[in-house]
């Protein structure tokens, strides 16, 4: 690889936090704030700069993974002296074997090693090297290039593995194509005798899809130690207490403590105080999957609430349930500042009508007095899956520059992001400006409903715009309320054509990224934080996104036998911090949901193309800015102390003269 291409290929995915003005950005409104409510062991992961050492840090490995390059472990900083030394060592077979060896996580084991494998890189051509398959990753390395070339792919990102012809590499060759969930495809070619001897295809299939082969996901074998326990990030009782709950209108209920009331809901829910358990059970019978309206968020002043649920089972004959009607009336009455209730149905009206014919449906306004029903016209999971497929086609491996804008438009991806953001803005505005309580549902209440509640809460509550607040938001609105991560992502499952797969959570994170672009100083986290979350949505390294609901996680011992992603992130917060962050606790954000204000997230969707990445990792520049900021703040504090000391000294010298206190120096850095 020539030097310019190597430099481009080694560039990290950027952290694109723009420098904001004095406020968090356009479209923000003010209201009083609500007060918020908590030595990593070294692993065996060397960076390329430390090839002589058998050890390295987990943090460095993950940074390289997240940096997201087609040759993500290429080291552009190896000196000529080191290169010369390493190339001399190539004559030593033991040294070469050591250099080619894949670094392992605690608990990770090698399953196959294959020499003379060719990686057919769409940007640099064929690269020959050694392929190592472990129970966590596929690791390809070429040590003969300057600098060394490494392709490190967690098996969890693999959607399917297919055999392909490799005639161009010799009649005695065979090949495989690896289709990934993170917007890339990989092609490998190797000798047929290696396939017969080592079963490369079979090994990849077996360990990329452990659940389909009677094995456990690697997260249950991962033994890294972190100084922070990420499982403690979210405690439902503490979070509801932060919101001022329980109160006279709302109670914390443990009716679902054994998951018998609703198996896809969390053990702890918040419901109206006056509602009896018997009536709640009747409401559950009238709601799909028993997902009754429960509180997600309450306004600190107006007491307007966001409640979430599933569709009512009215059916084609407009069936009614007096307990459900009374229940929604109780939700409305809990807000003394409004005599209205707005029901946001995330679905398209036509789709809701189809669901009604099949036994589902939506609230008839004649049966729910003072309730307004609004359809947000968001497409279903199948449309979103197809949209992402089209997007992948235009961004990988090559980009048609002459038709870029029209090709992006043809995927409808940004249009669906716009509709989702627009719906969340309507919800936030109804709560903040209209002081009206809202009920949100789609069909089952775990896809579009989670998108809308979490985005609206992000706009309304500045706590969720902090790192730990955002983690709590994901734990609460997505994980505990039963978004079906296992089905939507397909963890460890070889059924790549499963109709349940859909990029619902990816869309949510994309919407958050769009908000960070419009309000660059309103979020404590940076772009790397969001990319890290998405990378580990697929990786199966952590237990955070495993299973479909809280009950399943308890049954599978996820909380005791796996590590939380937040343990990793919260052990190195400076890596994921936005240096421009200002904690505007009293601001509500209203992002502009217009195509003119939205853009394709190139640093995520197109990060595998070395020609589309910045030459220098922006998140590294932001880290340096944070260090400079801290240094300047320390200097200001030192100067303030010095001025205070001089003032005291001057006052003492004047003796009986009137004392004058120094005016504090308030400096924003």
UniProtKB/Swiss-Prot annotation:
Keywords from the named record: Acetylation, Cell membrane, Cytoplasm, Hydrolase, Lipid metabolism, Membrane, Phosphoprotein
Region described as Required for dimerization: 612-669
PROSITE patterns linked: PPASE_MYOTUBULARIN (PS51339), TYR_PHOSPHATASE_1 (PS00383), TYR_PHOSPHATASE_2 (PS50056)
Modified residues (N-acetylmethionine): 1
Database matches in InterPro entries: GRAM, MTMR1_PH-GRAM, MTMR1_PTP, Myotubularin, Myotubularin-like_Pase_dom, PH-like_dom_sf, Prot-tyrosine_phosphatase-like, Tyr_Pase_AS
Subcellular localization(s) per the UniProt record: Cell membrane; Cytoplasm
Enzyme Commission number(s) of this protein: 3.1.3.-, 3.1.3.95
A GO term for molecular function: phosphatidylinositol-3-phosphate phosphatase activity
UniProt membrane topology term: Peripheral membrane protein
Stretches assigned to coiled coil: none
Keyword Acetylation: yes
Reaction(s) the record says it catalyses: a 1,2-diacyl-sn-glycero-3-phospho-(1D-myo-inositol-3-phosphate) + H2O = a 1,2-diacyl-sn-glycero-3-phospho-(1D-myo-inositol) + phosphate; 1,2-dioctanoyl-sn-glycero-3-phospho-(1-D-myo-inositol-3-phosphate) + H2O = 1,2-dioctanoyl-sn-glycero-3-phospho-(1D-myo-inositol) + phosphate; a 1,2-diacyl-sn-glycero-3-phospho-(1D-myo-inositol-3,5-bisphosphate) + H2O = a 1,2-diacyl-sn-glycero-3-phospho-(1D-myo-inositol-5-phosphate) + phosphate
Residues at the active site: 442 (phosphocysteine intermediate)
Compositionally biased spans, kind Low complexity: 1-17, 649-661
Tissue: Widely expressed. Detected in skeletal muscle, heart, lung, liver and brain.
Domain of life of the organism encoding this protein: Eukaryota
Domain GRAM span(s) in chain numbering: 94-165
GO biological process terms, semicolon-separated: phosphatidylinositol dephosphorylation
Entry note about domains: The C-terminal region is required for dimerization.
Family, as annotated: Belongs to the protein-tyrosine phosphatase family. Non-receptor class myotubularin subfamily.
Subunit structure, as described in the record: Homodimer.
Function: Could also dephosphorylate phosphatidylinositol 3,5-bisphosphate to produce phosphatidylinositol 5-phosphate.
Protein name in the entry: Phosphatidylinositol-3-phosphate phosphatase MTMR1
């Amino acid at each position: 690889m020539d030097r310019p291409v190597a430099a481009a290929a080694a560039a990290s995915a950027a952290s694109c936090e723009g420098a904001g003005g004095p406020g968090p950005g356009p479209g923000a409104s003010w209201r009083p704030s609500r007060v918020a409510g908590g030595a990593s062991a070294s692993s065996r992961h060397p960076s390329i700069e430390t090839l002589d050492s058998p050890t390295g840090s987990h943090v460095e490995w993950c940074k390289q993974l997240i940096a997201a390059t087609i040759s993500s472990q290429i080291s552009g900083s190896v000196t000529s002296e080191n290169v010369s030394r390493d190339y001399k060592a190539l004559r030593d077979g033991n040294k070469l074997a050591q250099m080619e060896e894949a670094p392992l996580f605690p608990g990770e084991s090698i399953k196959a090693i294959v020499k003379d494998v060719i990686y057919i890189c769409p940007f640099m051509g064929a690269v020959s090297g050694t392929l190592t398959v472990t129970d966590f990753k596929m690791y390809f390395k070429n040590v003969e290039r300057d600098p060394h070339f490494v392709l490190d792919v967690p098996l969890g990102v693999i959607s399917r593995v297919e055999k392909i012809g490799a005639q161009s590499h010799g009649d005695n060759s065979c090949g495989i194509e690896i289709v990934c969930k993170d917007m890339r495809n990989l092609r490998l070619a190797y000798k047929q005798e290696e396939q017969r001897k080592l079963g490369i295809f079979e090994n990849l299939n077996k360990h990329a899809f452990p659940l389909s082969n009677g094995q456990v996901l690697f997260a249950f074998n991962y033994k890294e130690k972190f100084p922070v326990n990420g499982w403690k990030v979210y405690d439902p009782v503490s979070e509801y207490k932060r919101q001022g709950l329980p109160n006279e209108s709302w109670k914390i209920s443990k009716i679902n403590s054994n998951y018998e009331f609703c198996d896809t809901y969390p053990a702890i829910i918040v419901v109206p105080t006056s509602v009896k358990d018997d009536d709640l059970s009747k409401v559950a019978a009238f709601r799909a999957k028993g997902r009754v309206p429960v509180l997600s968020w309450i306004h600190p002043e107006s007491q307007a609430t966001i409640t979430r649920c599933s569709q009512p089972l009215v059916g084609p004959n407009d069936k009614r349930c007096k307990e459900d009607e009374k229940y929604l009336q109780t939700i409305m009455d809990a807000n003394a500042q409004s005599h209205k209730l707005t029901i946001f149905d995330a679905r398209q009206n036509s789709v809701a009508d189809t669901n009604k014919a099949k036994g589902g449906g939506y609230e008839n306004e004649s049966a729910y007095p003072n309730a307004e029903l609004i359809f947000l016209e968001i497409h279903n999971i199948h449309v979103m899956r197809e949209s992402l497929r089209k997007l992948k086609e235009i961004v990988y491996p090559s980009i048609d520059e002459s038709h870029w804008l029209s090709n992006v438009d043809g995927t409808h991806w940004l249009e669906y992001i716009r509709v989702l953001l627009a719906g969340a803005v309507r919800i936030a505005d109804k709560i903040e400006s209209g002081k009206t309580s809202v009920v949100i549902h789609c069909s089952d209440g775990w896809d579009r409903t989670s998108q809308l509640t979490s985005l609206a809460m992000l706009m309304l509550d500045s706590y969720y715009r902090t790192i730990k607040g955002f983690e709590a938001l994901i734990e609460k609105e997505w994980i505990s309320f039963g978004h079906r991560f296992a089905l939507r992502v397909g963890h460890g499952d070889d059924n790549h054509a499963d109709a349940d797969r859909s990029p619902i959570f990816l869309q949510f994170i994309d919407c958050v990224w769009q908000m960070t672009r419009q309000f660059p100083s309103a979020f404590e986290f940076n772009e790397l934080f969001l990319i890290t979350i998405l990378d580990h949505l697929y990786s199966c390294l952590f237990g955070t996104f495993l299973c479909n609901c809280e009950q399943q996680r308890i049954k599978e011992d996820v909380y005791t036998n796996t590590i939380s992603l937040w343990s990793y992130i919260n052990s190195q917060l400076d890596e994921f911090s936005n240096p421009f962050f200002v904690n505007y606790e009293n601001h509500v954000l209203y992002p502009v949901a217009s195509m003119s204000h939205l853009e394709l997230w190139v640093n995520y969707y197109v990060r595998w193309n070395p020609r589309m990445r910045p030459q220098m990792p922006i998140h590294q520049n932001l880290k340096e800015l944070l260090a400079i900021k801290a240094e300047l703040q320390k200097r200001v504090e030192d100067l303030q102390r010095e001025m205070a000391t001089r003032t005291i000294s001057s006052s003492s010298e004047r003796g009986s003269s009137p004392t004058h206190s120094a005016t504090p120096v308030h400096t924003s850095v």
